[in-house]
Design a protein with these regions (language model features):
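Conserved acidic donor-binding segment of nucleotide-sugar-dependent glycosyltransferases
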Residues: 293-305, 313-318
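Aromatic "clamp/platform" in nucleotide-sugar-dependent glycosyltransferases that forms part
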Residues: 260
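Conserved donor-binding/catalytic core segment of Leloir-type glycosyltransferases
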Residues: 169-188, 194-201, 207
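Glycosyltransferase donor-sugar binding loop
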Residues: 205-222, 238
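Active-site donor-binding acidic/aromatic loop of nucleotide-activated sugar
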Residues: 216-218, 231-241, 248, 298
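Short hydrophobic beta-strand element within catalytic cores of glycosyltransferases
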Residues: 277-281
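Membrane-proximal helix-turn-helix segments that form the acceptor-binding/catalytic region
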Residues: 108, 113-137, 145
């Protein structure tokens, strides 16, 4: 089958969505399909640019290439998933969230514009009109599926995939640190972990790694670490190469991961692959699809006090932490989170 993966990317910005698309391309190729990935450059400012991109996507013809039919289109991200094709299947990573759950909140950068509401309504109308064109609609997590249903009235089945290099993760004896590998961004709430660390009764240490998305937030974290006198209990490693990151996973006592309203997030799955328990928050959403309180980790309220209590509990009972980590790995294996399953689902006749 000749398959085209349709996605979007902000030029020179690389994250989980890009790794997701590459993983899908590799899995389809390994299954014997001929695959091409098309990434539309995405720019969301000024807001009217979004309308131009919706129109441009709808005008694309991807039914054939050089006279050869394209058998299947798999759409991943807005606005690329709006491209018309008679045999299109959607595997939605996320919609344009500023038009949905981010609207009117701290993460909203659309409402401030005079035409923001008009653009929001146009995005919603396009999704509601054109997503149902697909033969089948899947989401990369239950959270994304629930958001699609809530705002657009569209049903989507969650279809899970493994993180990059899943087969390379291992577990090692736990050392004296908790690990938080994630982009430095307010939505990942590293600052909340710092505040919690200051309230811990146990001598908890936290190791942070990840690229900086928000330089101001990175400075705020450093300032707060100094103000609270936590310099000897916080390691800020910056971006970590994949091999080094897997080694941190292998040797940590557990992973603390408190993002706000996460869609999927590789961190939880990577922790499970390394047989490490996860501390997350009750509003982290995506991680809650895998973190079961008192079974594979701990779920705390998103306050410094509650998070500190969870960190203390994990730190103070190493045997329990190991049992929760092993349970997480067993849960991952039972879920059959494999690329083979993904490929079979996305290429079957709908």
């Amino acid at each position: 089958m000749r398959v085209l993966i349709a996605t979007a990317q902000v030029p020179f910005v690389r994250g989980g969505a890009e790794m997701h698309a590459e993983g899908l391309q590799a899995a389809l190729t390994a299954a014997g399909h001929q695959v091409e990935q098309v990434r539309l450059p995405f720019k969301w400012y000024p807001p009217e640019r979004i309308l131009d991109q919706i129109l441009a996507t709808r005008l694309l013809d991807v039914t054939e290439s050089s006279g050869n039919r394209i058998d299947r289109v798999i759409g991943l991200k807005f606005p690329a998933y709006l491209v018309p094709h008679p045999s299109k299947v959607l595997w939605i990573l996320h919609q344009f969230r500023q038009a949905y759950d981010f609207w009117g909140g701290e993460m909203d950068d659309l409402m401030q514009f005079p035409n923001g509401r008009e653009v929001r309504d146009a995005v919603r109308s396009a999704d509601q009109a054109f997503i149902p064109e697909a033969r089948a609609v899947y989401a990369n997590s239950q959270n994304v599926a629930a958001r699609l249903k809530r705002f657009c009235g569209i049903d989507a089945a969650p279809l899970y995939h493994p993180p990059p290099g899943a087969e390379l993760f291992r577990s090692a004896p736990a050392e004296d640190f908790l690990y938080l590998p994630s982009r430095v961004n307010p939505t990942k709430r590293q600052l909340l972990v710092v505040e919690a660390l200051a309230l811990c009764r146990e001598p908890v240490r936290v190791r942070f790694s990840g690229p900086v998305d928000d330089a101001g937030y990175e400075r705020a974290i450093g300032d707060r670490v100094r103000e609270l006198g936590l310099g000897d209990r916080v390691d800020r490693l910056g971006p970590a190469e994949e091999t080094a990151k897997r080694e941190h996973y292998a040797r940590c006592l557990g992973v603390v991961y408190p993002p706000v309203d996460e869609d999927y997030g590789y961190v939880t799955l990577e922790s499970m692959l390394a047989s490490k328990p996860v501390i997350t928050c009750s509003d982290s959403v995506g991680s809650l699809e895998f973190v079961r309180d008192g079974e594979t980790g701990l779920v705390a309220e998103p306050t410094a006090e509650a998070l500190a209590g969870a960190m203390d509990r994990l730190w103070g009972d190493r045997a329990q932490a190991a049992r929760w980590g092993a349970s997480g790995r067993e849960l991952y294996d039972r879920r059959d989170i494999t690329w083979q399953r993904v490929v079979a689902t996305l290429t079957r006749d709908a």
